[in-house]
Amino acid sequence: AAIGAGGKGNDITHDWASAERVIALCDVHPDGTHGVTDSRKTYPNANFYVDFREMLDNEKDLDAVTISTPDHTHAVIASNAMNRGLHVYVQKPLTHNIEEARVLTKIAAKNKVVTQMGNQGGSSTGVVKIQEWVDKKLIGKIHKIYAWTNRPVWPQGFDMESNEEEKPANLNWDLWLGPAASTKYTSQLHPFNWRGWWDYGTGALGDMGCHILDAPYKTLGLHYPTDVECSVGQVFQQAWSQNYVPKGCPASSIVTLNFDKTSKNDSKIELIWMDGGLRPSHPEFIPADDFLGEENSTNGVLMIGETGVISCGVYGLGPKLYRKGQETIEFSTDDYWKTLDHTHHMEWINGIKAGYGSDEYKKITAPFEYAGPFTETVLMGNLAIRSYMSMGKDKPKFSPNRYHTSEYSKFVGRKKLLWDGENMKITNFDEANKFVGRSRRSGWNI
């Protein structure tokens, strides 16, 4: 069954349905314009539900569900499904916050269900090739990683307009809100722009981090970071009046994560993430005319070693190996890209058929035992961003004479945050720990 039948849910259902039977569809907006109607027409024999809980109660023959809903509802839906013994495929990021990722990882292991996160790049031949280069130590010890994206491609960094809007007649807005606080309907959230608001989305980092950071995280065997810090871009809609929108994600950000050495790389690593159109400069060994990462340098990764650089685009595609005094090695993933989604979905389906812990299960590239800690690491960046933007109840008022006064220093979370990953705790700034999890409406616990 597909929970979330529009948008990405519509796309992936078409893919895995070529191998399996779709017996149910679920979406809070039955006649939504972003693919829900298409899904219902394509699978006319599938029972349709608005409430996922009703679907899980009624459909006794279900084996597995895909979850393609806004980030803030991933955990509550997935936990309900797994606790019923259902296998689950969840879009990236796995969850809305760090605590939820830890909980889902434990539930999956307890119930021995087959899981996969929808970061399809993990199944690319590009990641396999990068792993080969890392294992052979072709650029020596890797000490720095740059990763970046052109996201957001939705409005972000501004206040939400307070216009009164009429809710679409068939949209169940209360179900769409899920664990988030009750609020009036706005088209500024549904069906797409929810990504830029912390109650529902995870910003540019949450949207693309699991796609872009998968290659270095996996190939270098990274785990929890030791610390994190960030800076964010400023937006001024009026002179000397900086936007302060703590409920919304910033227009751009830079996040720095540090990791200890691993069994795959005998060096500490500094990982620098950039979004909002920011990207690194050309490092040594990469010719000035070469794109960084993918074409036009819009998204990418640079892994900086002692004697060279590994570059790739989103999903680990198109990796290149640059070494001093040697010809650049390029590995083409053009053909594989055409089947990337299908390969990722079929890993999950084959794992279900073979069973939890089977050889086929071990071929799954993003089961929750991997995707959970990985998502925690990605969302550490968002914890730092939210801490950076946190300053208490007072909204700052800037003027030419007060821009650098003590009022500006109220942003008390602008520091390096030290992280105890095993215990999910910031050890040097307790206020930031409120962003490890979230508050939930009654009836929406996981």
What are the language-model segments listed below?
Residues 1-3, 23-27, 48, 66-68, ...:
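Structural recognition of the beta-strand scaffold that forms the well-ordered cores
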Residues 1-90, 102-114, 357:
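N-terminal glycine-/serine-/threonine-rich beta1-alpha1-beta2 phosphate-ribose binding loop
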Residues 7, 11, 34, 38, ...:
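Extracytoplasmic/secreted proteins, especially bacterial periplasmic and envelope-associated proteins
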Residues 29, 49, 68-73, 94-96, ...:
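Short, solvent-exposed turn/loop segments enriched in Gly/Ser/Thr/Pro and often Arg
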Residues 87-89, 95-170, 175:
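A contiguous active-site-proximal alpha/beta segment in oxidoreductase catalytic domains
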Residues 164-165, 169-367, 372-396, 403-446:
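Glycine-rich, aromatic-lined ligand/substrate-binding cores of catalytic
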